[in-house]
UniProtKB/Swiss-Prot annotation:
Family (UniProt): Belongs to the EF-Ts family.
GO cellular component, one term: cytoplasm
Pfam families xrefs: EF_TS
Function comment: Associates with the EF-Tu.GDP complex and induces the exchange of GDP to GTP. It remains bound to the aminoacyl-tRNA.EF-Tu.GTP complex up to the GTP hydrolysis stage on the ribosome.
Disulfide bond residue pairs: none
Lineage start: Bacteria, Pseudomonadati, Bdellovibrionota, Bdellovibrionia, Bdellovibrionales
Cleaved signal peptide residues: none
PROSITE patterns recorded: EF_TS_1, EF_TS_2
Listed HAMAP family: EF_Ts
Compartment annotation: Cytoplasm
Main localization category: cytoplasm
Name of the protein described by the UniProt record: Elongation factor Ts
GO MF annotation: an example: translation elongation factor activity
Stretch list, region Involved in Mg(2+) ion dislocation from EF-Tu: 79-82
Length: 308
């Protein structure tokens, strides 16, 4: 049967599949539009499965507030330009909206999708992989909800390269609505994005991290010819410096290095008439810790030619 160009165009607009695939789908289903959508979905899901072993190390970080709840996620793709795709951005918006309404316990991808209970959240990624043509994965997610004595703030840097979420507290509930506290949260979130602290205070840095650093510093000092009896004292000073450089409250404030972040908290506290604290924070940097795959170009071309 003859398939009209208009019907092919409508199917393409609905599914975002290629023109030839849409034509094949309509021919295979005798022009039944809904059956053609399902045919493409099945074909797309098959294509998505083939992409499962690819490495997704690009993408973007997204951070948003939904009322008093903040959500930060990292979604990975195979190439950086996909993060600018409208479909990719729409996927991120839907995922953030879903996570703001649910808990993060267990496998979040197995959760019934909040906007359509006939789907699981993971189905959105399978469909996006098929539609966009690259492996799309949810790598990590975090969610904070403010209390009567705290506020949550999110900050995005560099078009989704770094996302920060922070919860700051005030000792008096009435101080939470003071604009100065929100400004403090924004300033500290920006600082965290720039300076990448390990923890809020030295007490929160794991003992094994400090122990490992001591080992490295001791070995370096021995290697440089320092006297063994002096090394312990030298390393103690170096560890103090290490902690100061990696603890948020002890770091020089990025917008005014003459004061520490802890000094900024005290200053804002005086302004709003309440003790101000940083309760927790999370910082996602795109692709951090992912080993990117590097292919031999000649081998890649040879592999592609096998299919022709």
């Amino acid at each position: 049967m003859s398939i009209s160009a208009t019907l092919v165009k409508e199917l393409r607009e609905k599914t975002n599949a290629g023109m030839m695939d849409c034509k094949k789908a309509l021919e295979a289903t005798s022009g039944d539009f809904n059956a053609a959508v399902e045919w493409l979905r099945v074909k797309g899901l098959g294509a998505a499965a083939k992409k499962a072993d690819r490495i997704a190390a690009e993408g973007a970080v997204f951070a948003e507030l939904h009322g008093n709840t903040g959500v930060v996620i990292e979604i990975n793709s195979e190439t950086d330009f996909v993060a600018r795709n409208d479909g990719f951005k729409a996927l991120a918006a839907n995922v953030v909206s879903h996570l703001a309404k649910t808990n993060l316990e267990g496998d979040v991808l197995a959760q019934a999708y909040a906007a359509d209970s006939s789907k699981k959240l993971g189905d959105l990624f399978t469909e996006a992989t098929a539609t966009i043509g690259e492996k799309i994965v949810l790598r990590r997610q975090e969610k904070y909800t403010a209390t009567a004595t705290s506020l949550v703030h999110t900050y995005l840097h560099g078009e989704g390269k770094i996302g920060v979420m922070i919860e700051v507290g005030a000792s008096k509930p009435e101080a939470v609505s003071n604009p100065a506290l929100k400004t403090f949260a924004q300033d500290v979130a920006l600082h965290i994005a720039a300076m990448n602290p390990m923890a809020i205070s030295s007490e929160q840095i794991p003992a094994d991290v400090v122990s490992k650093e001591k080992e490295i510093l001791t070995a370096k000092n021995l290697e440089s010819g320092k006297k063994p009896e002096m090394i312990e004292k030298i390393v103690e000073g170096q560890i103090r410096k290490f902690l100061a450089e990696n603890c948020l409250l002890d770091q020089p404030f990025v917008k005014n290095p003459d004061m520490k972040v802890s000094d900024l908290a005290k200053s804002v506290g005086k302004e709003i008439g309440a003790d101000v604290t940083v309760k927790r924070f999370v910082r996602f940097e795109l692709g951090a810790g992912i080993e990117k795959k590097t292919n031999d170009f000649a081998a890649e071309v040879a592999a592609q030619m096998k299919g022709h």
